[in-house]
UniProtKB/Swiss-Prot annotation:
Pfam families: 60KD_IMP, YidC_periplas. The keyword Transmembrane helix applies. Residues 33-85 are annotated as: Disordered. GO terms for molecular function: membrane insertase activity. This is Membrane protein insertase YidC. It is a multi-pass membrane protein. InterPro entries: Membr_insert_YidC, Membr_insert_YidC_N, YidC/ALB3/OXA1/COX18, YidC/Oxa/ALB_C, YidC_ALB_C, YidC_periplasmic_sf. Residues 36-51, 62-80 have a biased composition (Low complexity). Interacts with the Sec translocase complex via SecD. Specifically interacts with transmembrane segments of nascent integral membrane proteins during membrane integration. Belongs to the OXA1/ALB3/YidC family. Type 1 subfamily. Keywords: Cell inner membrane, Cell membrane, Chaperone, Membrane, Protein transport, Transmembrane, Transmembrane helix, Transport.
Length: 616
Protein backbone atom coordinates (compact mmCIF):
# COMPACT_ATOMS: atom_id res chain seq x y z
CA UNK A 1 0.00 0.00 0.00
CA UNK A 2 3.02 2.24 0.42
CA UNK A 3 3.31 2.74 -3.28
CA UNK A 4 -0.42 3.20 -3.91
CA UNK A 5 -0.21 6.97 -3.64
CA UNK A 6 2.77 7.09 -5.97
CA UNK A 7 1.05 4.79 -8.44
CA UNK A 8 -1.99 7.05 -8.38
CA UNK A 9 0.19 10.09 -9.08
CA UNK A 10 1.87 8.28 -11.95
CA UNK A 11 -1.50 7.24 -13.41
CA UNK A 12 -2.86 10.78 -13.19
CA UNK A 13 0.30 12.28 -14.66
CA UNK A 14 0.39 9.79 -17.51
CA UNK A 15 -3.30 10.42 -18.21
CA UNK A 16 -2.57 14.12 -18.52
CA UNK A 17 0.37 13.39 -20.81
CA UNK A 18 -1.84 11.23 -23.03
CA UNK A 19 -4.57 13.90 -23.21
CA UNK A 20 -2.15 16.71 -23.90
CA UNK A 21 -0.20 14.55 -26.33
CA UNK A 22 -3.37 13.74 -28.25
CA UNK A 23 -4.12 17.45 -28.51
CA UNK A 24 -0.55 18.33 -29.47
CA UNK A 25 0.24 15.60 -31.97
CA UNK A 26 -3.09 14.25 -33.31
CA UNK A 27 -5.61 17.08 -33.50
CA UNK A 28 -2.76 19.46 -34.26
CA UNK A 29 -2.83 23.15 -35.09
CA UNK A 30 -4.87 24.63 -37.89
CA UNK A 31 -5.43 22.54 -40.97
CA UNK A 32 -4.63 23.82 -44.45
CA UNK A 33 -7.01 26.37 -45.93
CA UNK A 34 -9.04 24.67 -48.58
CA UNK A 35 -9.37 27.20 -51.32
CA UNK A 36 -11.54 26.21 -54.26
CA UNK A 37 -10.61 27.85 -57.54
CA UNK A 38 -12.75 26.13 -60.14
CA UNK A 39 -16.44 25.74 -60.69
CA UNK A 40 -18.68 24.27 -63.40
CA UNK A 41 -19.40 26.56 -66.33
CA UNK A 42 -22.69 24.87 -67.13
CA UNK A 43 -25.33 27.37 -68.24
CA UNK A 44 -28.49 27.24 -66.13
CA UNK A 45 -31.87 28.82 -66.69
CA UNK A 46 -32.93 28.80 -63.05
CA UNK A 47 -31.38 28.49 -59.60
CA UNK A 48 -31.30 24.94 -58.21
CA UNK A 49 -33.30 24.29 -55.06
CA UNK A 50 -33.02 22.11 -51.98
CA UNK A 51 -35.70 19.62 -50.98
CA UNK A 52 -37.63 22.31 -49.12
CA UNK A 53 -37.66 24.62 -52.15
CA UNK A 54 -35.10 27.07 -50.78
CA UNK A 55 -32.81 28.43 -53.51
CA UNK A 56 -29.31 27.02 -53.77
CA UNK A 57 -26.62 29.18 -55.38
CA UNK A 58 -25.48 28.54 -58.93
CA UNK A 59 -22.58 29.62 -61.14
CA UNK A 60 -24.72 32.11 -62.99
CA UNK A 61 -24.59 34.40 -59.93
CA UNK A 62 -21.07 35.41 -60.82
CA UNK A 63 -19.24 33.04 -58.54
CA UNK A 64 -15.74 31.70 -59.04
CA UNK A 65 -15.11 30.74 -62.66
CA UNK A 66 -18.54 31.91 -63.80
CA UNK A 67 -18.48 33.85 -67.08
CA UNK A 68 -18.03 37.54 -66.45
CA UNK A 69 -20.87 39.86 -67.42
CA UNK A 70 -20.65 40.57 -71.14
CA UNK A 71 -18.60 37.45 -71.89
CA UNK A 72 -19.77 35.65 -75.03
CA UNK A 73 -21.11 32.11 -74.57
CA UNK A 74 -18.29 29.62 -74.81
CA UNK A 75 -15.62 32.18 -73.95
CA UNK A 76 -13.08 31.30 -71.29
CA UNK A 77 -14.39 31.81 -67.78
CA UNK A 78 -12.52 34.14 -65.48
CA UNK A 79 -11.43 33.36 -61.96
CA UNK A 80 -12.53 35.03 -58.74
CA UNK A 81 -12.25 38.79 -58.59
CA UNK A 82 -11.29 41.04 -55.72
CA UNK A 83 -13.88 42.03 -53.13
CA UNK A 84 -13.81 45.58 -54.47
CA UNK A 85 -14.59 44.46 -58.02
CA UNK A 86 -17.29 42.05 -56.85
CA UNK A 87 -18.95 44.76 -54.77
CA UNK A 88 -18.88 47.16 -57.72
CA UNK A 89 -21.04 44.83 -59.83
CA UNK A 90 -24.22 46.05 -58.14
CA UNK A 91 -25.57 49.30 -56.76
CA UNK A 92 -25.30 49.15 -52.98
CA UNK A 93 -26.62 50.68 -49.79
CA UNK A 94 -23.97 51.38 -47.19
CA UNK A 95 -24.04 49.77 -43.70
CA UNK A 96 -22.44 51.81 -40.92
CA UNK A 97 -22.79 51.05 -37.20
CA UNK A 98 -20.47 51.36 -34.18
CA UNK A 99 -19.55 47.68 -34.64
CA UNK A 100 -19.98 46.95 -38.37
CA UNK A 101 -19.46 48.43 -41.79
CA UNK A 102 -20.29 47.10 -45.24
CA UNK A 103 -23.18 47.19 -47.70
CA UNK A 104 -26.29 45.51 -49.07
CA UNK A 105 -26.47 44.92 -52.81
CA UNK A 106 -29.69 46.09 -54.44
CA UNK A 107 -29.37 43.16 -56.81
CA UNK A 108 -30.60 40.23 -54.76
CA UNK A 109 -30.83 42.25 -51.52
CA UNK A 110 -28.40 39.88 -49.82
CA UNK A 111 -26.49 40.88 -46.72
CA UNK A 112 -23.13 39.95 -48.22
CA UNK A 113 -20.65 42.64 -47.23
CA UNK A 114 -19.93 42.87 -43.50
CA UNK A 115 -16.67 43.73 -41.74
CA UNK A 116 -16.07 44.16 -38.01
CA UNK A 117 -14.84 47.58 -36.94
CA UNK A 118 -13.41 46.60 -33.58
CA UNK A 119 -11.58 43.39 -34.48
CA UNK A 120 -8.32 43.04 -36.37
CA UNK A 121 -6.52 40.05 -37.84
CA UNK A 122 -3.55 40.45 -35.48
CA UNK A 123 -2.77 42.20 -32.20
CA UNK A 124 -1.71 45.31 -34.11
CA UNK A 125 -4.44 47.90 -34.66
CA UNK A 126 -2.79 48.60 -38.00
CA UNK A 127 -3.61 45.11 -39.29
CA UNK A 128 -6.68 44.59 -41.52
CA UNK A 129 -10.08 44.39 -39.89
CA UNK A 130 -11.95 41.08 -39.83
CA UNK A 131 -14.03 40.55 -42.97
CA UNK A 132 -17.00 38.32 -42.13
CA UNK A 133 -19.33 38.25 -45.16
CA UNK A 134 -18.38 38.53 -48.84
CA UNK A 135 -20.43 38.58 -52.08
CA UNK A 136 -20.50 36.07 -54.91
CA UNK A 137 -17.73 36.61 -57.40
CA UNK A 138 -15.04 36.57 -54.71
CA UNK A 139 -12.90 33.54 -53.92
CA UNK A 140 -15.07 32.51 -50.96
CA UNK A 141 -18.57 33.99 -50.95
CA UNK A 142 -20.34 34.03 -47.60
CA UNK A 143 -23.71 35.73 -47.22
CA UNK A 144 -27.24 35.74 -45.78
CA UNK A 145 -30.40 35.77 -47.86
CA UNK A 146 -34.10 36.24 -47.10
CA UNK A 147 -37.06 35.59 -49.36
CA UNK A 148 -40.12 33.60 -50.36
CA UNK A 149 -40.65 30.36 -52.26
CA UNK A 150 -43.86 28.94 -53.66
CA UNK A 151 -45.59 27.40 -56.65
CA UNK A 152 -47.89 29.20 -59.11
CA UNK A 153 -47.09 32.55 -57.54
CA UNK A 154 -45.41 34.08 -60.55
CA UNK A 155 -41.91 35.56 -60.36
CA UNK A 156 -40.49 35.73 -56.83
CA UNK A 157 -37.47 37.69 -55.57
CA UNK A 158 -34.18 35.91 -56.28
CA UNK A 159 -30.46 36.59 -56.65
CA UNK A 160 -31.06 38.63 -59.83
CA UNK A 161 -33.93 40.76 -58.53
CA UNK A 162 -33.19 44.49 -58.62
CA UNK A 163 -34.79 46.15 -55.59
CA UNK A 164 -35.56 49.84 -55.13
CA UNK A 165 -34.22 51.51 -51.99
CA UNK A 166 -35.55 54.54 -50.12
CA UNK A 167 -32.12 55.65 -48.95
CA UNK A 168 -28.37 55.16 -49.23
CA UNK A 169 -27.51 54.25 -45.62
CA UNK A 170 -28.45 51.52 -43.12
CA UNK A 171 -27.53 52.51 -39.57
CA UNK A 172 -28.94 52.18 -36.05
CA UNK A 173 -32.16 54.19 -35.99
CA UNK A 174 -32.13 54.50 -39.80
CA UNK A 175 -33.82 51.43 -41.31
CA UNK A 176 -33.73 50.71 -45.02
CA UNK A 177 -36.86 50.00 -47.06
CA UNK A 178 -36.59 47.92 -50.24
CA UNK A 179 -39.47 47.34 -52.67
CA UNK A 180 -40.10 45.17 -55.73
CA UNK A 181 -43.19 44.46 -57.84
CA UNK A 182 -43.28 41.16 -59.72
CA UNK A 183 -45.68 42.57 -62.30
CA UNK A 184 -48.24 39.82 -61.69
CA UNK A 185 -50.01 41.09 -58.63
CA UNK A 186 -47.45 40.60 -55.86
CA UNK A 187 -45.74 43.58 -54.26
CA UNK A 188 -42.80 42.89 -51.93
CA UNK A 189 -41.57 45.31 -49.30
CA UNK A 190 -38.56 44.64 -47.08
CA UNK A 191 -37.59 46.77 -44.10
CA UNK A 192 -34.07 46.09 -42.82
CA UNK A 193 -32.94 47.47 -39.46
CA UNK A 194 -29.67 47.04 -37.58
CA UNK A 195 -28.69 47.68 -33.97
CA UNK A 196 -25.40 49.08 -32.72
CA UNK A 197 -23.81 45.61 -32.44
CA UNK A 198 -24.41 42.55 -34.65
CA UNK A 199 -28.16 42.00 -35.11
CA UNK A 200 -30.12 42.71 -38.30
CA UNK A 201 -33.93 42.61 -38.26
CA UNK A 202 -35.59 41.85 -41.60
CA UNK A 203 -39.33 42.56 -41.88
CA UNK A 204 -40.77 41.14 -45.11
CA UNK A 205 -44.20 42.28 -46.27
CA UNK A 206 -45.97 40.87 -49.31
CA UNK A 207 -49.26 42.16 -50.71
CA UNK A 208 -51.43 40.22 -53.13
CA UNK A 209 -53.16 42.65 -55.52
CA UNK A 210 -54.17 39.90 -57.94
CA UNK A 211 -57.57 38.25 -58.23
CA UNK A 212 -56.27 34.83 -57.14
CA UNK A 213 -55.06 33.45 -53.80
CA UNK A 214 -51.32 32.82 -53.51
CA UNK A 215 -49.43 30.48 -51.17
CA UNK A 216 -45.88 31.39 -50.18
CA UNK A 217 -43.25 30.08 -47.75
CA UNK A 218 -40.86 32.55 -46.08
CA UNK A 219 -37.23 31.48 -45.76
CA UNK A 220 -33.83 32.68 -44.64
CA UNK A 221 -30.43 31.12 -45.15
CA UNK A 222 -26.71 31.47 -44.54
CA UNK A 223 -24.52 30.23 -47.40
CA UNK A 224 -20.76 29.72 -47.50
CA UNK A 225 -18.78 28.72 -50.59
CA UNK A 226 -15.68 26.61 -50.05
CA UNK A 227 -14.47 24.99 -46.88
CA UNK A 228 -12.72 27.63 -44.76
CA UNK A 229 -9.54 27.19 -42.79
CA UNK A 230 -10.44 25.63 -39.45
CA UNK A 231 -8.52 25.34 -36.19
CA UNK A 232 -8.82 21.56 -36.22
CA UNK A 233 -9.09 21.11 -32.44
CA UNK A 234 -11.35 18.56 -30.82
CA UNK A 235 -12.38 21.06 -28.12
CA UNK A 236 -13.87 23.49 -30.64
CA UNK A 237 -16.75 23.15 -33.11
CA UNK A 238 -16.48 25.00 -36.41
CA UNK A 239 -19.02 24.52 -39.15
CA UNK A 240 -22.80 24.30 -39.37
CA UNK A 241 -24.66 24.85 -36.13
CA UNK A 242 -28.18 25.42 -34.90
CA UNK A 243 -30.82 24.82 -32.27
CA UNK A 244 -33.82 23.03 -33.79
CA UNK A 245 -36.72 23.12 -31.33
CA UNK A 246 -36.96 20.00 -29.21
CA UNK A 247 -34.07 18.40 -31.09
CA UNK A 248 -31.81 20.90 -29.37
CA UNK A 249 -28.29 21.79 -30.40
CA UNK A 250 -27.07 20.36 -33.70
CA UNK A 251 -23.42 20.65 -34.71
CA UNK A 252 -22.17 19.45 -38.09
CA UNK A 253 -18.60 19.87 -39.25
CA UNK A 254 -17.99 20.67 -42.90
CA UNK A 255 -16.97 17.07 -43.47
CA UNK A 256 -19.91 15.58 -41.58
CA UNK A 257 -22.68 17.31 -43.52
CA UNK A 258 -21.26 15.96 -46.79
CA UNK A 259 -21.75 12.42 -45.49
CA UNK A 260 -25.49 12.85 -45.06
CA UNK A 261 -27.96 11.27 -47.55
CA UNK A 262 -28.94 13.01 -50.78
CA UNK A 263 -31.17 16.00 -50.15
CA UNK A 264 -33.32 17.55 -52.83
CA UNK A 265 -31.29 16.89 -55.94
CA UNK A 266 -28.08 15.78 -57.53
CA UNK A 267 -24.80 16.65 -55.83
CA UNK A 268 -26.59 17.81 -52.65
CA UNK A 269 -26.43 16.11 -49.27
CA UNK A 270 -27.98 17.24 -46.05
CA UNK A 271 -30.41 16.81 -43.21
CA UNK A 272 -33.67 18.53 -42.31
CA UNK A 273 -35.62 18.95 -39.09
CA UNK A 274 -39.32 19.47 -39.77
CA UNK A 275 -42.06 21.14 -37.77
CA UNK A 276 -39.81 22.54 -35.05
CA UNK A 277 -40.53 25.67 -33.03
CA UNK A 278 -37.89 27.89 -31.49
CA UNK A 279 -34.25 28.01 -32.46
CA UNK A 280 -31.86 29.24 -35.11
CA UNK A 281 -29.33 27.99 -37.69
CA UNK A 282 -26.00 29.31 -38.87
CA UNK A 283 -22.34 28.79 -39.61
CA UNK A 284 -19.74 29.38 -36.93
CA UNK A 285 -16.01 29.98 -36.79
CA UNK A 286 -13.95 30.07 -33.64
CA UNK A 287 -14.74 33.71 -32.86
CA UNK A 288 -17.29 34.78 -35.50
CA UNK A 289 -20.66 33.53 -36.71
CA UNK A 290 -23.60 34.24 -38.99
CA UNK A 291 -26.99 32.88 -37.95
CA UNK A 292 -30.52 33.08 -39.37
CA UNK A 293 -33.16 33.42 -36.67
CA UNK A 294 -36.83 32.76 -37.50
CA UNK A 295 -39.86 33.85 -35.50
CA UNK A 296 -39.59 31.89 -32.26
CA UNK A 297 -43.29 31.13 -31.81
CA UNK A 298 -43.96 29.70 -35.28
CA UNK A 299 -43.02 26.25 -36.64
CA UNK A 300 -40.35 25.95 -39.31
CA UNK A 301 -38.18 23.46 -41.15
CA UNK A 302 -34.45 23.76 -40.57
CA UNK A 303 -31.83 22.24 -42.87
CA UNK A 304 -28.07 21.77 -43.17
CA UNK A 305 -26.82 21.04 -46.69
CA UNK A 306 -23.69 20.65 -48.77
CA UNK A 307 -23.88 21.08 -52.53
CA UNK A 308 -21.05 20.22 -54.90
CA UNK A 309 -20.74 22.50 -57.90
CA UNK A 310 -17.70 21.59 -59.96
CA UNK A 311 -14.79 21.73 -57.54
CA UNK A 312 -16.62 23.95 -55.07
CA UNK A 313 -18.42 22.83 -51.94
CA UNK A 314 -21.30 25.11 -50.98
CA UNK A 315 -22.44 24.85 -47.36
CA UNK A 316 -25.84 26.19 -46.38
CA UNK A 317 -28.04 26.40 -43.30
CA UNK A 318 -31.64 27.47 -43.81
CA UNK A 319 -35.03 27.86 -42.20
CA UNK A 320 -38.35 27.75 -44.06
CA UNK A 321 -41.57 28.82 -42.41
CA UNK A 322 -44.99 27.27 -42.81
CA UNK A 323 -47.20 28.18 -45.75
CA UNK A 324 -48.78 31.63 -45.84
CA UNK A 325 -51.87 31.85 -48.05
CA UNK A 326 -52.75 35.33 -49.28
CA UNK A 327 -56.29 35.94 -50.44
CA UNK A 328 -56.84 38.62 -53.09
CA UNK A 329 -56.07 42.09 -51.67
CA UNK A 330 -54.56 40.52 -48.52
CA UNK A 331 -51.06 40.98 -47.15
CA UNK A 332 -48.71 39.17 -44.79
CA UNK A 333 -45.72 40.13 -42.66
CA UNK A 334 -42.82 37.92 -41.58
CA UNK A 335 -40.03 39.09 -39.28
CA UNK A 336 -36.70 37.29 -39.21
CA UNK A 337 -33.29 38.20 -37.91
CA UNK A 338 -29.65 37.77 -38.81
CA UNK A 339 -26.78 37.68 -36.35
CA UNK A 340 -23.51 38.52 -38.08
CA UNK A 341 -20.55 39.33 -35.89
CA UNK A 342 -18.29 38.45 -33.00
CA UNK A 343 -19.40 35.82 -30.48
CA UNK A 344 -19.17 38.12 -27.47
CA UNK A 345 -20.54 36.24 -24.47
CA UNK A 346 -22.49 39.07 -22.85
CA UNK A 347 -23.91 40.25 -26.17
CA UNK A 348 -25.03 36.75 -27.17
CA UNK A 349 -26.77 36.35 -23.81
CA UNK A 350 -28.39 39.77 -24.18
CA UNK A 351 -29.83 38.82 -27.58
CA UNK A 352 -31.18 35.58 -26.14
CA UNK A 353 -33.04 37.52 -23.46
CA UNK A 354 -34.16 40.44 -25.63
CA UNK A 355 -35.57 38.42 -28.53
CA UNK A 356 -36.38 35.18 -26.71
CA UNK A 357 -34.06 33.19 -28.97
CA UNK A 358 -34.03 29.57 -27.86
CA UNK A 359 -30.61 28.57 -26.46
CA UNK A 360 -28.77 31.24 -28.39
CA UNK A 361 -25.98 31.03 -25.81
CA UNK A 362 -24.99 27.68 -27.37
CA UNK A 363 -23.57 29.68 -30.26
CA UNK A 364 -20.47 29.63 -28.03
CA UNK A 365 -19.00 26.16 -27.67
CA UNK A 366 -18.95 25.79 -23.89
CA UNK A 367 -18.61 22.03 -24.26
CA UNK A 368 -19.92 19.15 -22.18
CA UNK A 369 -18.53 20.70 -19.00
CA UNK A 370 -20.39 23.99 -19.45
CA UNK A 371 -21.22 23.92 -15.73
CA UNK A 372 -17.50 24.54 -15.13
CA UNK A 373 -16.54 26.66 -18.14
CA UNK A 374 -19.37 29.17 -17.77
CA UNK A 375 -18.68 29.98 -14.08
CA UNK A 376 -14.97 30.14 -14.89
CA UNK A 377 -15.62 32.74 -17.58
CA UNK A 378 -17.97 34.69 -15.33
CA UNK A 379 -15.33 34.89 -12.63
CA UNK A 380 -12.60 35.95 -15.06
CA UNK A 381 -14.87 38.51 -16.71
CA UNK A 382 -15.91 39.97 -13.35
CA UNK A 383 -12.34 40.56 -12.22
CA UNK A 384 -11.35 41.81 -15.67
CA UNK A 385 -13.92 44.60 -15.43
CA UNK A 386 -12.68 45.26 -11.91
CA UNK A 387 -8.93 45.18 -12.65
CA UNK A 388 -8.68 45.73 -16.40
CA UNK A 389 -6.36 42.80 -17.11
CA UNK A 390 -7.39 39.23 -17.89
CA UNK A 391 -3.95 37.92 -16.89
CA UNK A 392 -4.30 39.39 -13.41
CA UNK A 393 -7.84 37.98 -13.33
CA UNK A 394 -6.42 34.50 -13.97
CA UNK A 395 -3.99 34.91 -11.07
CA UNK A 396 -6.72 36.15 -8.74
CA UNK A 397 -9.25 33.44 -9.70
CA UNK A 398 -6.55 30.81 -9.18
CA UNK A 399 -5.87 32.20 -5.71
CA UNK A 400 -9.59 32.18 -4.87
CA UNK A 401 -9.89 28.58 -6.05
CA UNK A 402 -6.93 27.68 -3.86
CA UNK A 403 -8.64 29.27 -0.87
CA UNK A 404 -11.94 27.56 -1.70
CA UNK A 405 -10.32 24.13 -1.82
CA UNK A 406 -8.00 24.90 1.09
CA UNK A 407 -9.67 22.50 3.59
CA UNK A 408 -9.37 19.55 1.19
CA UNK A 409 -5.85 20.47 0.15
CA UNK A 410 -4.77 21.01 3.75
CA UNK A 411 -6.01 17.58 4.79
CA UNK A 412 -4.18 16.10 1.84
CA UNK A 413 -0.93 17.85 2.61
CA UNK A 414 -1.21 17.06 6.32
CA UNK A 415 -1.67 13.39 5.45
CA UNK A 416 1.34 13.59 3.12
CA UNK A 417 3.38 15.22 5.88
CA UNK A 418 2.44 12.46 8.32
CA UNK A 419 3.39 9.87 5.74
CA UNK A 420 6.82 11.45 5.41
CA UNK A 421 7.19 11.38 9.18
CA UNK A 422 6.67 7.60 9.23
CA UNK A 423 8.92 6.91 6.23
CA UNK A 424 11.50 5.11 8.43
CA UNK A 425 8.80 2.76 9.78
CA UNK A 426 7.48 2.15 6.27
CA UNK A 427 10.98 1.30 5.07
CA UNK A 428 11.40 -1.07 8.00
CA UNK A 429 8.11 -2.83 7.16
CA UNK A 430 9.14 -3.27 3.52
CA UNK A 431 12.45 -4.80 4.57
CA UNK A 432 10.84 -7.02 7.20
CA UNK A 433 8.19 -8.43 4.84
CA UNK A 434 9.95 -8.07 1.51
CA UNK A 435 9.13 -11.68 0.64
CA UNK A 436 5.50 -11.55 1.77
CA UNK A 437 3.45 -8.87 0.00
CA UNK A 438 0.25 -9.73 1.87
CA UNK A 439 1.78 -9.25 5.32
CA UNK A 440 3.56 -6.13 4.07
CA UNK A 441 0.26 -4.58 3.00
CA UNK A 442 -1.41 -5.58 6.28
CA UNK A 443 1.39 -4.00 8.30
CA UNK A 444 1.20 -0.84 6.19
CA UNK A 445 -2.55 -0.58 6.74
CA UNK A 446 -2.10 -0.97 10.50
CA UNK A 447 0.50 1.80 10.44
CA UNK A 448 -1.81 4.09 8.43
CA UNK A 449 -4.65 3.40 10.85
CA UNK A 450 -2.48 4.02 13.89
CA UNK A 451 -1.12 7.33 12.55
CA UNK A 452 -4.46 8.36 10.95
CA UNK A 453 -2.98 8.57 7.48
CA UNK A 454 -4.92 8.42 4.22
CA UNK A 455 -2.44 6.93 1.72
CA UNK A 456 -4.20 8.44 -1.32
CA UNK A 457 -4.97 11.83 0.21
CA UNK A 458 -2.11 13.41 -1.71
CA UNK A 459 -3.94 12.74 -4.96
CA UNK A 460 -6.75 15.16 -4.21
CA UNK A 461 -4.87 18.39 -5.03
CA UNK A 462 -4.02 16.94 -8.45
CA UNK A 463 -7.51 15.58 -9.07
CA UNK A 464 -9.05 18.94 -8.17
CA UNK A 465 -6.70 20.77 -10.51
CA UNK A 466 -7.56 18.67 -13.58
CA UNK A 467 -11.16 19.93 -14.16
CA UNK A 468 -10.11 23.49 -13.32
CA UNK A 469 -7.26 23.20 -15.82
CA UNK A 470 -9.53 22.05 -18.64
CA UNK A 471 -12.25 24.59 -17.79
CA UNK A 472 -9.72 27.41 -17.98
CA UNK A 473 -8.25 25.96 -21.17
CA UNK A 474 -11.70 25.91 -22.76
CA UNK A 475 -12.41 29.49 -21.73
CA UNK A 476 -9.08 30.72 -23.06
CA UNK A 477 -9.55 28.83 -26.29
CA UNK A 478 -13.15 29.64 -27.25
CA UNK A 479 -14.05 33.07 -25.85
CA UNK A 480 -13.33 36.09 -27.99
CA UNK A 481 -12.86 38.15 -24.84
CA UNK A 482 -9.50 36.38 -24.36
CA UNK A 483 -8.44 37.04 -27.97
CA UNK A 484 -5.64 39.62 -28.06
CA UNK A 485 -6.03 40.20 -24.30
CA UNK A 486 -2.62 41.33 -22.99
CA UNK A 487 -0.86 40.45 -19.74
CA UNK A 488 2.43 42.20 -19.01
CA UNK A 489 5.70 42.45 -20.88
CA UNK A 490 5.89 40.37 -24.02
CA UNK A 491 2.54 38.62 -23.53
CA UNK A 492 0.12 40.60 -25.70
CA UNK A 493 -2.35 37.77 -26.36
CA UNK A 494 -3.28 35.38 -23.55
CA UNK A 495 -5.09 33.13 -26.02
CA UNK A 496 -1.94 32.60 -28.10
CA UNK A 497 1.29 30.75 -27.19
CA UNK A 498 4.17 32.62 -25.59
CA UNK A 499 5.73 34.43 -28.59
CA UNK A 500 9.31 34.13 -27.32
CA UNK A 501 11.49 31.22 -28.39
CA UNK A 502 14.49 29.45 -26.97
CA UNK A 503 15.76 29.05 -30.54
CA UNK A 504 16.79 32.73 -30.73
CA UNK A 505 17.47 32.95 -26.98
CA UNK A 506 14.15 34.72 -26.36
CA UNK A 507 14.91 37.56 -28.74
CA UNK A 508 18.56 38.13 -27.84
CA UNK A 509 19.65 36.84 -31.23
CA UNK A 510 18.51 39.09 -34.11
CA UNK A 511 16.36 36.68 -36.11
CA UNK A 512 12.88 35.22 -36.05
CA UNK A 513 12.77 31.42 -35.72
CA UNK A 514 11.17 29.84 -38.80
CA UNK A 515 7.72 28.36 -38.30
CA UNK A 516 8.73 24.90 -39.48
CA UNK A 517 10.98 24.37 -36.43
CA UNK A 518 8.95 21.98 -34.22
CA UNK A 519 10.35 23.30 -30.95
CA UNK A 520 8.20 26.14 -29.63
CA UNK A 521 9.42 26.92 -26.14
CA UNK A 522 8.98 30.36 -24.65
CA UNK A 523 9.81 31.95 -21.32
CA UNK A 524 6.55 31.13 -19.55
CA UNK A 525 6.57 27.39 -20.39
CA UNK A 526 10.08 27.24 -18.94
CA UNK A 527 8.93 29.08 -15.80
CA UNK A 528 6.08 26.60 -15.51
CA UNK A 529 8.51 23.69 -15.88
CA UNK A 530 10.72 25.10 -13.13
CA UNK A 531 7.79 25.48 -10.72
CA UNK A 532 6.66 21.93 -11.49
CA UNK A 533 10.20 20.66 -10.92
CA UNK A 534 10.37 22.44 -7.54
CA UNK A 535 6.98 21.06 -6.53
CA UNK A 536 8.09 17.50 -7.24
CA UNK A 537 11.37 17.99 -5.40
CA UNK A 538 9.43 18.90 -2.26
CA UNK A 539 8.86 15.17 -1.78
CA UNK A 540 11.34 12.31 -1.52
CA UNK A 541 11.93 10.35 -4.70
CA UNK A 542 9.80 7.19 -5.10
CA UNK A 543 11.65 4.02 -4.10
CA UNK A 544 10.81 2.34 -7.41
CA UNK A 545 13.44 3.31 -10.05
CA UNK A 546 10.93 3.37 -12.91
CA UNK A 547 8.57 5.65 -11.01
CA UNK A 548 11.50 7.86 -10.06
CA UNK A 549 12.45 8.22 -13.74
CA UNK A 550 8.86 9.06 -14.70
CA UNK A 551 8.70 11.77 -12.04
CA UNK A 552 12.09 13.12 -13.07
CA UNK A 553 11.06 13.57 -16.71
CA UNK A 554 7.55 14.82 -16.01
CA UNK A 555 8.47 18.55 -15.75
CA UNK A 556 10.43 18.31 -19.00
CA UNK A 557 7.57 16.60 -20.83
CA UNK A 558 5.01 19.14 -19.61
CA UNK A 559 7.30 22.06 -20.44
CA UNK A 560 7.46 21.03 -24.09
CA UNK A 561 3.80 20.01 -24.19
CA UNK A 562 2.60 23.38 -22.93
CA UNK A 563 4.96 25.28 -25.22
CA UNK A 564 2.22 25.59 -27.85
CA UNK A 565 -0.65 26.13 -25.41
CA UNK A 566 -2.24 29.54 -24.74
CA UNK A 567 0.01 31.71 -22.61
CA UNK A 568 -2.82 32.33 -20.15
CA UNK A 569 -3.05 28.63 -19.42
CA UNK A 570 0.69 28.31 -18.88
CA UNK A 571 0.67 31.32 -16.57
CA UNK A 572 -2.17 29.72 -14.60
CA UNK A 573 -0.26 26.46 -14.21
CA UNK A 574 2.95 28.19 -13.14
CA UNK A 575 1.07 30.33 -10.61
CA UNK A 576 -0.88 27.34 -9.29
CA UNK A 577 2.35 25.36 -8.85
CA UNK A 578 3.88 28.28 -6.96
CA UNK A 579 0.91 28.51 -4.60
CA UNK A 580 1.01 24.74 -4.08
CA UNK A 581 4.70 24.85 -3.18
CA UNK A 582 4.10 27.63 -0.63
CA UNK A 583 1.10 25.82 0.84
CA UNK A 584 2.91 22.51 1.10
CA UNK A 585 5.99 24.15 2.64
CA UNK A 586 3.94 25.88 5.36
CA UNK A 587 1.97 22.72 6.23
CA UNK A 588 5.09 20.55 6.39
CA UNK A 589 6.86 23.01 8.68
CA UNK A 590 3.81 23.22 10.95
CA UNK A 591 3.74 19.43 11.26
CA UNK A 592 7.44 19.26 12.03
CA UNK A 593 8.23 17.41 8.81
CA UNK A 594 11.48 18.09 7.04
CA UNK A 595 11.15 19.78 3.66
CA UNK A 596 13.05 17.61 1.20
CA UNK A 597 13.57 20.28 -1.45
CA UNK A 598 17.14 21.32 -0.66
CA UNK A 599 18.31 17.80 0.12
CA UNK A 600 16.83 16.55 -3.15
CA UNK A 601 18.50 19.33 -5.11
CA UNK A 602 21.86 18.73 -3.44
CA UNK A 603 21.51 14.99 -4.00
CA UNK A 604 20.73 15.55 -7.67
CA UNK A 605 23.83 17.67 -8.20
CA UNK A 606 25.99 15.23 -6.24
CA UNK A 607 24.82 12.37 -8.45
CA UNK A 608 25.59 14.48 -11.48
CA UNK A 609 29.10 15.20 -10.24
CA UNK A 610 29.73 11.53 -9.45
CA UNK A 611 28.58 10.50 -12.92
CA UNK A 612 30.85 13.07 -14.52
CA UNK A 613 33.79 11.93 -12.39
CA UNK A 614 33.16 8.28 -13.27
CA UNK A 615 33.16 9.08 -16.98
CA UNK A 616 36.33 11.08 -16.59
Amino acid sequence: MGNDKTNMFVAIALSLVVLLGWHYFVTGPASERQRQAAQSQTAQTGAPQTADGIPSPSPREGGPNAPAPGTLPGAAAQGPVSREDALARSARVRIDTPALYGSIGLKGARIDDVSLKNYHETVSDESPRIVLLSPTGTANPYYAEFGWVGANAGPLPNADTLWKADGDLLAPGRPLTLTWDNGQGLVFKRIVAVDDKFMFTVRDEVENTSANPVTLYPYSLVSRWGKPQTQGYYVLHEGLIGVLGGDGLQEYTYDKVGKEPAYGGAATQGKAWTNVTGGWVGITDKYWAAAAIPEQDKPFTGAFTERTDGATKIYQTSVRGDAVTLAPNASSVTTQRLFAGAKEVNQINAYEREFGIKQFDLMIDWGWFWFLTKPMFRALDFFFHLLGNFGVSILLVTLILKLFFLPIANRSYVSMAKMKAVQPEMTSIRERYKDDRVKQQQAMMELYKKEKINPVAGCWPVLIQIPVFFALYKVLFITIEMRHAPFFGWIQDLAAPDPTSIVNLFGLLPFTPPEYIPIHLGVWPIIMGITMFIQMKMNPAPPDPVQAQVFAFMPIVFTFMLGSFPAGLVIYWAWNNTLSVIQQYVIMRRNGVKVELWDNLRGMFKRGNKSAAAKG
